[in-house]
């Protein structure tokens, strides 16, 4: 048996583009986006794809074609949205450290809203907007102090986290923002974490934020939208992920008759299970205490296992009638932490292709050049067709900015 992405066998993609190779299913991207649209249809939401999950231009372009808005956290991500044909007027600018240059870029581009996360940021956006003679549409990201029950590195809604304005300080912060002449308050935002597998924290956060919405309205600050962020998890192994329909019903019931536009910022749940990392076995190494399957992908290609001790299902692309072994699936990087899977039972040998599942989110977007390794190519599959959406990086491209400096030094010395 051979594994396929849609109607294309993975070995054909490996032959055409080499490995390691990120492979994405266009139909899976579409299905995930439409799942949100259908589940929340009664609330007519603006679904803003979180670009940080995977910023490939072709993926952004595809979501734009479906009517998606975008959630960005940097000027670079905004540039990607614009380059891919995304609509700035449907783009939310989040993030705790927006520079003046990024704010100016976003104001000139006409983003829908800035999610402000601190008093100093309120001051900075006011300053830049005044200098440009513009009015900045803003909301405040409020930290509801709700435990997302996820990995601590991706929990963002507790008092101890760097994100957002403390719940107890929210009313005061809104009144301060309302006094700024170049800011227009249009919404409220929260985002409590990523890879949530329990619905209750999401509902609790919504409840707490709506209490603030009512308190603000009573004091004359009437909001136009409610941004509940993202965070809905996906299945990597055996997780029970929240049902979007149940989530939508809970949110609809909580919003009730309030006239609030709902904004959602999903990332992982749109792209995570739409992508896989295709890799080839270099060696099988048998040891006294541990066996190792050495592959040509590594932690620089997929950081999640090393960073979060995250699980990704790994399987052989072609079924063979050979003995299985239990081994760690590891890359060639000089780190003991360079692993893609631990203690996996698999049947493979040198030259075989392996598929690392659920790698569409925080895979390519977190890749690096550690050990001077080139970043992987990326392919998008649509039915029986496929196309390259990112060329494999070359050593010349990897070293270009440094070589230019060396050449300039040489010219100056001469």
Swiss-Prot record:
InterPro entries named among the record's database cross-references: Ala_racemase/Decarboxylase_C, DAP_deCOOHase_LysA, De-COase2_C, De-COase2_CS, De-COase2_N, Orn/DAP/Arg_de-COase, PLP-binding_barrel
Pathway given in the UniProt record: Amino-acid biosynthesis; L-lysine biosynthesis via DAP pathway; L-lysine from DL-2,6-diaminopimelate: step 1/1
Cofactor field: pyridoxal 5'-phosphate
Residues at the catalytic site: 334 (proton donor)
UniProt-listed Enzyme Commission number(s): 4.1.1.20
Reaction equations catalysed: meso-2,6-diaminopimelate + H(+) = L-lysine + CO2
Alphabetical UniProt keywords: Amino-acid biosynthesis, Decarboxylase, Lyase, Lysine biosynthesis, Pyridoxal phosphate
Residues engaged in binding pyridoxal 5'-phosphate: 231, 265-268, 362
Domain of life where this protein originates: Bacteria
Assembly and oligomerization: Homodimer.
Similarity comment: Belongs to the Orn/Lys/Arg decarboxylase class-II family. LysA subfamily.
Listed name of the protein: Diaminopimelate decarboxylase
Organism: Neisseria meningitidis serogroup B (strain ATCC BAA-335 / MC58)
């Amino acid at each position: 048996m051979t594994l396929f992405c849609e109607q294309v066998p993975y070995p054909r993609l490996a032959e055409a583009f080499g490995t390691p190779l990120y492979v994405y299913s266009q139909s899976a991207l579409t299905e995930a986006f439409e799942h949100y649209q259908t589940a929340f249809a009664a609330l007519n939401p603006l679904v803003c794809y979180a670009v940080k999950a995977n910023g490939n231009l072709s993926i952004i372009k595809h979501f734009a074609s479906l009517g998606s808005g975008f959630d960005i956290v940097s000027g670079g991500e905004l540039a990607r949205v614009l380059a891919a044909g995304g609509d700035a007027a449907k783009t939310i600018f989040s993030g705790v450290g927006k520079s003046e240059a990024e704010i100016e870029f976003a104001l000139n581009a006409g983003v829908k809203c800035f999610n402000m996360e601190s008093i100093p940021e309120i001051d900075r956006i006011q300053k830049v907007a005044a200098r440009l003679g513009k009015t900045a549409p803003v909301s405040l990201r409020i930290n509801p102090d709700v435990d997302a029950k996820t990995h601590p590195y991706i929990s963002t809604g507790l008092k101890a986290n760097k994100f957002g304005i403390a719940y107890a300080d929210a009313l005061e912060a809104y009144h301060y923002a309302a006094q700024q002449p170049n800011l227009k308050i249009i919404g409220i935002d929260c985002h409590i974490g990523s890879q949530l597998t329990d619905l209750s924290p999401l509902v609790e956060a919504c409840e707490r934020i709506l209490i603030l919405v009512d308190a603000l309205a009573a004091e004359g600050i009437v909001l136009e939208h409610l941004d509940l962020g993202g965070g809905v998890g996906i299945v990597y192994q055996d997780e029970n992920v929240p049902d979007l329909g149940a989530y939508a019903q809970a949110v609809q019931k909580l919003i009730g008759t309030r006239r609030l536009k709902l904004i959602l910022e999903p990332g992982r749940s749109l792209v995570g299970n739409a992508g896989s990392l295709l890799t080839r076995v270099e060696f099988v190494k048998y040891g006294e205490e541990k066996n190792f399957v050495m592959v040509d992908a590594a932690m620089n290609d997929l950081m999640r296992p090393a960073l979060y001790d995250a699980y990704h299902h790994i399987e052989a692309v072609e079924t063979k009638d050979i003995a299985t072994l239990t081994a760690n699936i590891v890359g060639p990087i000089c780190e003991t932490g360079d692993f893609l899977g631990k203690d996996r039972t698999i049947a493979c040998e040198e030259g075989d292709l392996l598929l690392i599942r659920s790698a569409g989110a925080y895979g390519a977007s977190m890749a690096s050049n550690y050990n001077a390794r080139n970043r992987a190519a990326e392919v998008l599959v649509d039915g029986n067709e496929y196309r390259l959406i990112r060329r494999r990086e070359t050593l010349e491209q990897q070293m270009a900015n440094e070589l230019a400096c060396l050449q300039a030094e040489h010219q100056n010395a001469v």
